[in-house]
Design a protein with these regions (language model features):
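Formylglycine-dependent sulfatase
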Residues: 1-196
């Protein structure tokens, strides 16, 4: 999808996790050249070798995205609470904390009790609100790549807040330790009343 070619012609083969996405056109570069504002929020896993946004050869902002917020490494997207280790994980990479990047800054230490589905939803909603406030006439492309359900099969901390749309439900607060309005309670604990 990102390269705009049939999967039989794609350069990422055989689940080669974290292989660098070739320096070629992506849907984001094409749309950005056409005047769109672009963002990728969620799980990426196509960065190549390196340790940070500057050294990763194919970091999302180097492949056509104006903004990136999410997991860069494939393995990090297996756990849904980035600042909390998953103690029953079946590998060391599952049991340790994960890295979430916001453009060129690693922010996982600010994400206490943030469940990634809520986090990526809230960040996406806020990105749309911000874009509408700064450039309402400019078209946009938002690629939202959730990491759930996957490996850890963790659940949220609480029931979803009332309301809907950009100003209701899950919302971005943007404060360290309280990035989203559902970052409360005990991690991996919410059970819907119908299933108790």
């Amino acid at each position: 999808f990102l390269m705009g070619v049939h999967q039989g012609h794609a350069t990422v083969r055989n689940n080669q996790f974290d292989k660098a996405l070739h320096d070629n056109h992506t849907v984001a570069t094409v749309l950005r050249e056409a005047g769109y504002k672009t963002a990728l929020i969620g799980k990426y896993g196509l960065q190549g070798k390196g340790q940070d946004a500057e050294s990763w050869e194919a970091y999302p902002t180097k492949r056509g995205f104006d903004e990136f917020f999410g997991y860069v490494a494939h393995r990090d997207g297996h756990v849904h609470y980035p600042s909390h280790p998953w103690p029953i994980g079946n590998s060391e990479s599952h049991r340790t904390g994960k890295q979430v990047w916001w453009n060129e800054r690693e922010v996982s230490s600010e994400l206490t009790r943030c469940y990634t589905t809520d986090l990526f939803t809230a960040r996406s909603k806020q990105w749309i609100i911000d874009h509408r406030g700064t450039a309402p006439e400019q078209p946009f492309f938002l690629y939202l790549a959730f990491d759930t359900p996957h490996a850890a099969l963790q659940v949220p901390t609480c029931a979803y807040p009332e309301g809907q749309g950009l100003n209701g439900g899950v919302r971005w607060l943007g404060r360290s330790g309280k990035m989203i309005n559902t970052a409360t309670g005990t991690i991996d604990s919410y059970r819907h009343p119908d299933y108790i």
